């Protein structure tokens, strides 16, 4: 029990030094403030999703991502994503990060179905540093059935 309190004290110290220690708690000056901010932002997001519907909410997020990509440029946007991934890896540890990725892959396979997931992997496997999987497939005449990529309803 004491170790849980020690951990909270350490997180609070880090928050007071300006570090974000709670996902969604950016701007909070203490651990408790960051927890409250994260909770409020989460509730706000849920409310907005209910207002717009699932598809509208997803589209709004997509447009926001595209705007950010235009602001930062392709390279800056990619770098931002890389830094976010590295930060998450530090938070979860190597094993936790790997497990999170594995669970995400399993979830995606369930959403798409085995055949669609395999077809998407085929396309991804064709990619190189200089060419996307789709570009290489087109150049080499490899048929990729992207209709299989659809998420099951």
Curated annotation (Swiss-Prot):
Pfam families: LEA_5 (PF00477)
Top-level taxon of origin: Eukaryota
Keyword Ribonucleoprotein: no
UniProtKB keywords: Repeat, Stress response
Induction pattern: By abscisic acid (ABA) and osmotic stress.
Per-repeat ranges for Sequence: 43-62, 63-82, 83-102, 103-122
Name by which UniProt lists this protein: Late embryogenesis abundant protein B19.4
């Amino acid at each position: 029990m004491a170790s849980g309190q020690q951990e909270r004290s350490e997180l609070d110290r880090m928050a007071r030094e300006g570090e974000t220690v709670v996902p969604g708690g950016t701007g909070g000056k203490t651990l408790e403030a960051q927890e409250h901010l994260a909770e409020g932002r989460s509730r706000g997001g849920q409310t907005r999703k209910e207002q717009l519907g699932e598809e509208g909410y997803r589209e709004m997020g997509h447009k926001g991502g595209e705007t950010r990509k235009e602001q930062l440029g392709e390279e800056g946007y990619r770098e931002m994503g890389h830094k976010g991934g590295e930060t998450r890896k530090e938070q979860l540890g190597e094993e936790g990060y790997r497990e999170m990725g594995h669970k995400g892959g399993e979830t995606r396979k369930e959403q798409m179905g085995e055949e669609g997931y395999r077809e998407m992997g085929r396309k991804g496997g064709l990619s190189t540093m200089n060419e996307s999987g789709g570009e290489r497939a087109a150049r080499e005449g490899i048929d990729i059935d992207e209709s299989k990529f659809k998420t099951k309803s």
